[in-house]
């Protein structure tokens, strides 16, 4: 083999190894990505039990039930559909009925969302952008849910431009 052929063989081999490594990394990341879904999206997508995802919406008023050993159940609604949620752990201090929530976990075989992480709104105007957008899209947005997503950002841009 000439020098040029050896160099091309080495470059080709390196590219193949790099391609395989990239494919493995992308495959691993694809499996660990958690998507955000509203209860309506969950019912439309027919998400399989055990598949991890994030569930966002409002905690339905009157649905919070506290059990033994930090077990809690409640329903998450997006105005069109509701989904029962079961969680075992300490809820955030700002967790309330009628407030925005994002829970991470998976559906069990009975259709109950088994959450292992629950996030609640952190001040009087916060709502996850995805939840607010979903509520607006479905026509269920109410102005008393808090500041519209991006409102603080828009007002700061106005102050800068003046």
Curated annotation (Swiss-Prot):
GO MF assignments: heme binding; metal ion binding
The protein's name in its UniProt record: Cytochrome c-type biogenesis protein CcmE
SUPFAM superfamilies (alphabetical): Heme chaperone CcmE (SSF82093)
UniProt cross-references to HAMAP family, sorted A to Z: CcmE
Single GO BP term: cytochrome complex assembly
Cytoplasmic domain ranges by topology: 1-7
Residue intervals on the Periplasmic side: 29-162
Spans traversing the lipid bilayer: 8-28
Similarity field: Belongs to the CcmE/CycJ family.
Gene: ccmE
Subcellular location: Cell inner membrane
Keywords assigned by UniProt, alphabetized: Cell inner membrane, Cell membrane, Cytochrome c-type biogenesis, Heme, Iron, Membrane, Metal-binding, Signal-anchor, Transmembrane, Transmembrane helix
Membrane topology: Single-pass type II membrane protein
Keyword Chloroplast assigned: no
Organism from which the protein derives: Nitrobacter winogradskyi (strain ATCC 25391 / DSM 10237 / CIP 104748 / NCIMB 11846 / Nb-255)
